[in-house]
Amino acid sequence: HAYHHLAYLEPDSGALFAGDVAGIRLPGQSYVRPPTPPPEIDVDAWIKSINHIRRITPASLYPTHFGCYDDVERHLGELEQRLQDWLLFVEERMDGGAGSEEIADELKDKGDAEMLAEGADTEETRHYDLAGNYEMLTIGIMRYVERRRKTA
């Protein structure tokens, strides 16, 4: 997620206190949202961290936002897929000349549709937005894309 974040495994229970690397998920929901605020999102490192979590096979995940989840592989798979999908989505719109506000509006439409498809209601989409709003998430992804392009 970011170079300064850590995760802690409790060996007796197998619980991984994963922080933001495990995404945003509200209790009672299956939907996992990647928290991508600026300034230090690193998608490549994040995916490596997700794969590292898979290798240590925790029994449960405790993301910063919120709760405890036992469906570790499903959770991580959805997070990784959505992270890569959102990165491509934002990058394509940047290439088309869209600015951060336009991209954030489009990402909100996309993200809300994804949540509703997984059974959330409009009130729950608002709760997810409180945990990580699209304007902030979009700016984080855009900064990552710009930084990656400068070093390519």
How would you describe each model-predicted region?
Residues 19, 43, 73-76, 80, ...:
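Amphipathic, non-membrane alpha-helical segments in soluble helical-bundle scaffolds
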Residues 92-152:
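C-terminal regulatory/interaction regions
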Residues 1-29:
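Catalytic core of the metallo-beta-lactamase
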Residues 31-40:
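Surface-exposed cleft-lining segments at the edges of enzyme active sites
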Residues 1, 67-68, 111:
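Glycine-rich beta-alpha junction loops
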Residues 40-44, 135:
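Conserved phosphate-coordination/catalytic loops
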Residues 45-100:
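Divalent-metal (often Zn2+) His-rich catalytic cores of metallo-beta-lactamase-fold enzymes
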